């Protein structure tokens, strides 16, 4: 055990000793009832499952979320999480057991995992008293006898146990101890570094009947796509807690950076927001059947907080800047023959917060990867007939750097999962999600988000009910 962990455990021993006197077990033990939530089943019900975590601070990052709004976080997490994890350690994570009932009052459906440094039965009784449904037991701080003793108490209270391991030795112990849920911590507890490849190395060694969770260091949807074949779910905390827009961060993590373009009516804007799409595209090219003028655009996006992208084609610079400013666009997307001079001049007159995206034919992208435009934040890669709703052969992008590329052209429910295998920054959907030009089809949008969430194609024709999970 390293010095940091030793310090934490010594402090935890003192915490337990103090709280046993402050809040003796006999004062609340007869008020404890067995949990009626099933943490294990929540992880099995959908693949991948997500344990979304509430965490104010950590030893490695310090303060992560200074204004921890438990009610706001709970309202968001209850839409997307399979289970909710709450850090209750006070000194190092600025947590509290009293966080649990606040979250439980709002998130009625999700089991709650209490994450702490469990070393004493008292902590387990306390966790259940405050309505936790599962606990984390770390093999890095417990010997086998201690682990079994604590697990038996948890199971007596009908609480599940997430057994955390950090290395192969601990994994062997977890298997021998017949752990039902194993969490692979991608963090090195000696130096606090992160390596998500650890999940790929250790997961294949675990029997299939055991549920595997990947913990720590998960940054984005592409990483989840890579790790999903190895695990049942993910525990994600720090990367979400540090974001100003939590719901957007959750949607990006679970569904990816997706844009639905060609929006022409407010009902569609509200729908794509509700189902976790991050970017909404507004087309200001007059030749497009999905053309919308500035005033109409303003009225349909009013009070719906998406990141809006304005699409322009060889438009007057001042008009692009005017519309971008009036609508507070996230980015302007140039879809014509705009050259470097045009882009430079546009950059000078655009508000600093508005990004520039440039559509480019995939053949041109392949030829000029090292000599693309300056002052462009993202590239929309399309086929040679951009905007036609047709795909191109994606194998040409296989060895390209795609972290600033948004794939477009004929994307739909049937090919979206194959597209996400490429690892692009994001994906641009339009005509294939419509019932007619500019009119989006609700069932297709729901089926798309189902598919992206589960990483498998979902047939919208079989859609019976709507929902986010």
Curated annotation (Swiss-Prot):
Bifunctional enzyme that catalyzes two sequential steps of tryptophan biosynthetic pathway. The first reaction is catalyzed by the isomerase, coded by the TrpF domain; the second reaction is catalyzed by the synthase, coded by the TrpC domain. Residues 258-469 are annotated as: N-(5'-phosphoribosyl)anthranilate isomerase. InterPro entries: Aldolase_TIM, Indole-3-glycerol_P_synth, Indole-3-glycerol_P_synth_dom, Indole-3-GlycerolPSynthase_CS, PRAI_dom, RibuloseP-bd_barrel. It comes from Buchnera aphidicola subsp. Baizongia pistaciae (strain Bp). This is Tryptophan biosynthesis protein TrpCF. One of its GO terms (molecular function) is indole-3-glycerol-phosphate synthase activity. In the N-terminal section; belongs to the TrpC family. In the C-terminal section; belongs to the TrpF family. Residues 1-257 are annotated as: Indole-3-glycerol phosphate synthase. HAMAP family: IGPS_B, PRAI. Monomer.
